[in-house]
Amino acid sequence: MTQPLGKNDGGYFGETIRISDVLERTLAAAEQHGWSVELFPGAGELPLYGMRRLAKRERLSVYISTGIHGDEPGGPVALAEMLEANAWPSDVSLYLCPCLNPTGFPGNTRENLAGIDLNRDYRHFKSPEVTAHKAWIDGLPEFDIAICLHEDWEAKGFYLYELNPEKQFAASEAMLEAVGAVCPIDQSELIDGRPAKGGLLRPIASPDARPLWPEAFYIVQNNKTRLSYTLEAPSDFPMPTRVDALCTAVKSLIELHLATR
């Protein structure tokens, strides 16, 4: 199994990307494979894109986003590779956001160019990026599951957060088993200060008690979906390992949910 590189110390010091090149790949693949692509309402000069591909006979609807932290390059690369591979099941409607923080990547910063952590802005909407993203999300129909692609520079392996307030069927454990074949799973009992088991965290605190909301909170609290997976690849590992882990996780979640339909 692949080992960590040992480069991260106090932050992410691994391989970086030119986000404009990754988005160019993503947009080219979307055009080639018949996706509808639009700029977020009010995005201005920011390259904030929403993509959709609707199934003619829908069995499952899925929302996927990434690139909200500029020091987490694996997610945008993974989504670009999935669009290029075009291996999505034909009976799944998909709504994608390929990069939510385009100004963070040039400086390899978690925050945007103005110093705002966008993934803590989904309650008060102070940033233009999140305000524009909210406008796009609010115009979407409800979807069955949401998948947010992230990375963690401190993680010992792959892990995820599951938001599932109604305790409906979730595929977290089976997905982790699939990912474990390509990337180590973080087996820590505490991850980011929260209880975890086998790489799975299920937050129990009410979002109403949190003054700052991540993207997943907004989506679930506003009933766009009642099941959200936030995937965290370990960014101290080589880029191909992290990308493979995220792609495997997304593919597994979609297949596992389709199997229950």
Question: Where is each model-derived feature located?
Answer:
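Structured catalytic-domain cores with a bias toward divalent-metal coordination
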Residues: M1-R261
